[in-house]
A protein has these predicted regions:
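Charged, flexible cofactor/metal-binding loops and thiol motifs
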Residues: 3-6, 24, 237-325
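P-loop NTP-binding/switch modules centered on Walker-like glycine-rich loops
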Residues: 46, 175, 179-183, 187-264
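Helix-to-loop junction immediately C-terminal to a conserved catalytic motif
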Residues: 59
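Conserved ABC transporter NBD signature motif
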Residues: 67-75
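Conserved ABC ATPase "signature" region
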Residues: 75, 126-144, 253-254
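Conserved ABC ATPase signature
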Residues: 149-153, 157
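A short, proline-enriched helix->beta-strand linker immediately N-terminal to the Walker B motif
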Residues: 168-172
Length: 325
């Protein structure tokens, strides 16, 4: 009997609640995902749905409230700070804003060298300098920028610094937290192509967080759709775009600009109503109050996250009926 491949990273019923004045804000609520080695899982959803919190909780930059985070089969939620230090080099993050996420007082080489020095992997300055030069070359930063400062560079080069810093300790898993959203469109494609080239060359595994559906389609093997802290649909990238099953996913995809105005009117799915409060939400589908297809099964209990076709999961009791329309 063939053994099932152990994913590089897996979350099981992961939760992150923040204490607020009136209760608990459910930022990440019972999310179970898996990412195989060398693959990219895209995470999409509107602002405030919990995308960035999910990524940072997986890295334990934010401590989870409940659930498991398995990295190469080991639950890192049970690791002490000392034990986590060994995993930090294997799990890195590229932040959204390439300027605010780097120290403006440090030069390019000093920024990239910082994690190398902290890790203690290289002892001599010559070894560290050689590693920095290698990383700069890998991400397409000219050697003449070695002693430059962030304010002297454009957004694309600053983000390349962020990529080089994330790669400094040879990680296996990288959270890309909207790494191109703050960049000009002309630069976005360059950074996306760089990330994909690095994945091919180094065997990297990505959790790619974005609100741009055209970007996530370009880079992801699988896509998970989040709404108010919950994963409501997950499928291979092509399958999700060709056959979305959840009404919220359909609405998101209908918002993608198309050049044909007649096609735009045919595919429009307008979401009406107010977003449900994420503070101690009642059981049931959190999209139901805005959904034109809501039924009695949508209230009273959270919809089951079901596999409706191979690899295609959806949390909607109406999914089969909507699929045949």
């Amino acid at each position: 009997m063939e053994q099932k491949q152990v994913p590089l990273l897996e979350t099981r019923n992961l939760k992150k609640y923040f204490k607020v004045k009136n209760g608990f804000l459910h930022a990440v609520d019972d999310i179970s995902l898996r990412i195989d080695q060398g693959h990219t899982l895209g995470v999409v959803g509107e602002s405030g749905c919990g995308k960035s919190t999910l990524g940072r909780t997986i890295l334990r930059l934010i401590e989870p409230s409940a659930g498991e985070i398995l990295f190469q089969g080991k639950d890192i939620t049970k690791c002490s700070k000392k034990e986590m230090r060994a995993y930090r080099s294997q799990m890195q993050i590229i932040f959204q804003d390439p300027y605010s996420s780097i120290n403006p007082r440090l030069s390019v080489s000093e920024i990239i060298a910082e994690p190398i020095i902290v890790s203690g992997q290289y002892r001599s300055r010559a070894e560290i300098g050689k590693k920095v030069e290698q990383l700069m070359d890998t991400v397409g930063l000219a050697s003449r920028l070695y002693n430059a400062y962030p304010h002297e560079l454009d957004g694309g080069r600053r983000q390349r610094i962020g990529v080089a810093r994330a790669l400094a300790l040879d990680p296996k898993f990288v959270v890309c937290d909207e790494p191109v959203s703050a960049l000009d469109v002309s630069i976005q494609a360059q950074i996306l192509n760089l990330l994909m080239d690095l994945q091919d060359a180094l065997g990297l595994t990505y959790l790619f967080i974005t609100h741009d559906l055209s970007v996530v389609k370009h880079i992801s093997d699988e896509i998970a759709v989040l709404y108010l802290g919950q994963c409501i649909e997950k499928a291979p990238s092509r399958e999700l775009f060709a056959n979305p099953m959840h009404p919220y996913t359909k609405a998101l995809l209908s918002a993608i600009p198309v050049p044909d105005l007649s096609m735009r009117s045919k595919k429009a799915h307008i979401i009406r109503g107010e977003v449900t409060s994420p503070i101690d939400p009642k059981p049931g589908c959190r999209f139901a109050v805005r959904c034109e297809h809501a039924c009695p099964e949508c209230t009273g209990a959270d919809p089951a996250f079901r596999e409706l076709s191979p690899g295609h999961w959806c949390a909607c009791p109406m999914a089969e009926k909507l699929a045949v329309r």
